[in-house]
Amino acid sequence: MAVKEGEKYDLRFYLNAPGYKGTLTVEIYDVEKGKTVGSETLHPASLDHWTELTATLQAASDARHCELRIVFGASGQSVVWVDYVSLFPQNTFKGRKNGLRKDVAEMLAGLQPQFMRWPGGCIVEGATLDNRVRWKETLGDPMTRRGEWSLWGYRSTYGFGYHEFLQFCEDLGMEGMFVANAALGCSFRNGDYTDDPAELERYLQDIRDAIDYAIGDPS
């Protein structure tokens, strides 16, 4: 990953290391130059259970090829589990929390797009219906978003969810095209579907809810 001099990056991660007593140093390490360009030492009271840890790291210099490192200060051995590691720039497009990378968003803005679709095409269907994108699961705290294996061969974190999509449309003054599943999985990969009336009604209600979330009365 690349960092810019003076920019701040919010780190959030979860650790479970039963019995570990000691400090942790989190650092942005410049692999090309072999040096640390930003770090902070944490003093967790206990890691005997899953614990959320946060820090703000500021880059001392520009660096193109960096790693995030977690250095354990105590000697000895311990089993460590790590989950949900997020290093996010504070300087996002329009200052949005959990917003878009500024340079990418500015390039998109320069194209002056008239609309954007979300979540996409085939990913809406999913490899199977069970694998489809569920927009309600892309809302809220990014850590609680379940994510989904994508039929394109990688896992989607849902980090850019329905809410972020709507915000981005507002920021660029473009129309938002919400693509809904029509109770049909990808016909090329599986072709499963439902024609049960009660199940179809749930699909329709989900679409109505999405429209209401976007343009309905906020009260």
Regions found by a protein language model. Give the residues of each.
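A general structural detector for well-ordered alpha-helical segments in enzyme core domains, enriched
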Residues: 103-107, 161-168, 206, 210
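Conserved radical SAM core fold
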Residues: 183-185
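Short mixed-charge
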Residues: 213-219
